[in-house]
Amino acid sequence: MRITDFDALRLQVSQPELDAYRARNTPELDDLTAYLSGEDNLLDAQAIAAHLFATEPVDVFLSHAHADHDAVVALAVTLERLGLRVFVDACVWGDVYALLLKVDQARAGIPGEPGVFNYTRATRNAANMYMILSVALQRMIDQSELLLFLDSSAVRVQDYVEGEAYIGSPWIFAELMFAQMVARRPRLAGIGTENLSEALARNEAGATAPMVRYRLPESSHTMPSATLKRLISSATFAATLATRFRLRSSSYDFLDQFYRELPLSAAERELLGWADEAR
């Protein structure tokens, strides 16, 4: 699901709320030995994924560009207020780079040259780490009910081909491609991500690294950010009334209203358990 003009979405979230969300969702790094196993000090993919990513399914997975991080966390906080479980992996990536640096220092360092690494070993370390994270992200997407691709000017690169849209993030590209292929399952009685390559795109001198452009995968549905904001405002008001008058309220109330704004197919309605409802 693509949210267009995400740049225009302005949500009222206080700085303490933003800081609290990041604190709750930023895992602390353990000692490197916790992720190594065997005599050859092999990276333990399962241990890394289990530590950095939630094990419980989430309602909403936020897929986004690194530059939109603050606005994405504000959206996550707002959706959490409505009772939804939200995954924003931007809070994880900083630890990933710190962990990768520790791995390089332990397995790719050149004796007598601090901060200098063996290129081949460091490249393999990065490839292994990114593969581990890619699989973990796919698992999170598979376990979520809804993936929201937050499309903004920060996501895209200059488009030189008329009628074609491109993005500069390999991670967003991978997430959206996987979301197209993942099996859709009936609702049980959710999508983000920070762009890894963007976070490393500037070296110490401030130069921008070469960027690859990726054709933007199509989304099953599209919604303007203004519509999303209207739905959030309506759901927030309804939740306030429910609390005041002790009425029944569910996190699915917002998702149901969200889905009703979309031109759902018969198959999608059936997955939501709405097949028997009057059209």
Model-inferred region functions:
Residues 1-144, 263-279:
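Conserved N-terminal substructure of TIR/SEFIR domains
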Residues 119-122, 135, 142, 181-197:
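Acidic, metal/cofactor-coordinating or nucleic-acid-engaging core segments within structured domains
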Residues 128-129, 155-185:
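Conserved TIR/SEFIR loop-to-helix hotspot centered on a Trp-containing motif
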Residues 151:
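Glycine-rich, N-terminal phosphate-binding loop of Rossmann-like dinucleotide-binding domains
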